[in-house]
Amino acid sequence: MFVDEVEIKVKGGQGGNGVVSFRREKFEPMGGPDGGDGGDGGNVILRVDEGLNTLADFRYQRHYEAERGYHGSGKNKHGRSGEDLVLKVPPGTVVYDADTDELLADLTEDGEEYIVAHGGKGGRGNARFKKSTRKAPRFAEKGEPGEERSIRLELKLVADVGLIGFPNVGKSTLISVVSEARPKIANYHFTTLKPNLGVVALSEYKSFVMADIPGLIEGAHQGVGLGDEFLRHIERTRLLIHIIDISGIEGRDPLEDFKTINRELEKFNEKLSSRPQIVALNKIDLPGARENVERVQPVLEEKGYKVFPISAATKEGVKELIYYTGDLLKELPVERKIAKEDRIVIKPDFADEEENIVVEKKNGIYEVSGRLVEKYVIKTDFNNDAAVKRLLRVLQHHDLNELLRDKGVKNGDTVKIGPMEFEYME
């Protein structure tokens, strides 16, 4: 089954917990802290596999989570990091944040990877907290949760040439005679229900990729017919071959067909209307077709189009069309990627972050937000008194009590920091 758009949820692995441990040596029952760190959680990674051509593998499973990191142990043994979860996608997969619609990645090359959800960092063991004024720390950190997000995957096929035109004009027949592609071919509309890719070999060392785009009709940009489901696959092509049924057997005017398809391209994406086009007047083997060629070809050539009368069924004129296409492609730039703004993302070190704490009262609850204090809360083991005391010292260091009092907090009020709720007490 061909699937070219899907939404999934991904989550990086939870970081492993650090451990509280002390050396047990002969004559030194409390020989100092030796608790190891927890391992980092695994990442969720998208990797391009050129053997795939659909997103169908994501149709029935929509939630993916990488392996969590392992906990630390005594003797300064750090936990193993969780295994990355690699999800294979076809070339041409575009990744969007499903909530913000932000373009995250455009994956086109075989083996190309993108980390779509980072694993959580492992918690530090108590050996990390030893210092001159704290020789026997009895607390460690819990691991951080992995990054979690919803993403939308869209497949935009990677092809040099796109075949466009009304249904039943001969696109599938053409790609079948010039490549090894074997699309379903029949004499009725919308026979082609998915794009077909074929490699056109001009010589042993020269070839290009052609995509047979399912038939477009008026209103395609709004989803009429097979519509915008397949228009996106034209976006990556460098060149379009516009196939027209010159026989008139369908009862339509060839010139009106040409205008209609180009209007749909422009309405869907203005850049498509300026994409170079070669016109193939197909089915010249049928009665009356050559007379129509004499009428239509001069009109299109006057507009600046290169026109080839062909018969995909008998292969007449096909060789000339394909070799001209190959020559023209040599002159056109290769632009595979969908443009996005360059962004430099700097993740500050946990210990060096400057905190900006905000306190807001919502529905009677005082909600505290701040990257650092929220992270400390997440990493605190509330079953460990020493860890809780350390958290209170951190919050006091950041003047949280003063900020809460400024907002009018009273004893017994609920204070929420990250996922945790506390009862305020002076």
From Swiss-Prot:
Gene3D superfamilies: GTP-binding protein OBG, C-terminal domain, GTP1/OBG domain, P-loop containing nucleotide triphosphate hydrolases. It is an enzyme of class 3 (hydrolase). It is found in: Cytoplasm. GO terms for cellular component: cytoplasm. Keywords: Cytoplasm, GTP-binding, Hydrolase, Magnesium, Metal-binding, Nucleotide-binding. Monomer. Belongs to the TRAFAC class OBG-HflX-like GTPase superfamily. OBG GTPase family. It comes from Halothermothrix orenii (strain H 168 / OCM 544 / DSM 9562). One of its GO terms (molecular function) is magnesium ion binding. InterPro entries: G_OBG, GTP-bd, GTP-bd_Obg/CgtA, GTP-bd_prot_GTP1/OBG_C_sf, GTP1-OBG_CS, GTP1_OBG_dom, GTP1_OBG_dom_sf, OBG_GTPase. This is GTPase Obg. Its cofactor is Mg(2+). Disulfide bonds: none annotated. An essential GTPase which binds GTP, GDP and possibly (p)ppGpp with moderate affinity, with high nucleotide exchange rates and a fairly low GTP hydrolysis rate. Plays a role in control of the cell cycle, stress response, ribosome biogenesis and in those bacteria that undergo differentiation, in morphogenesis control. Signal peptide: none annotated.
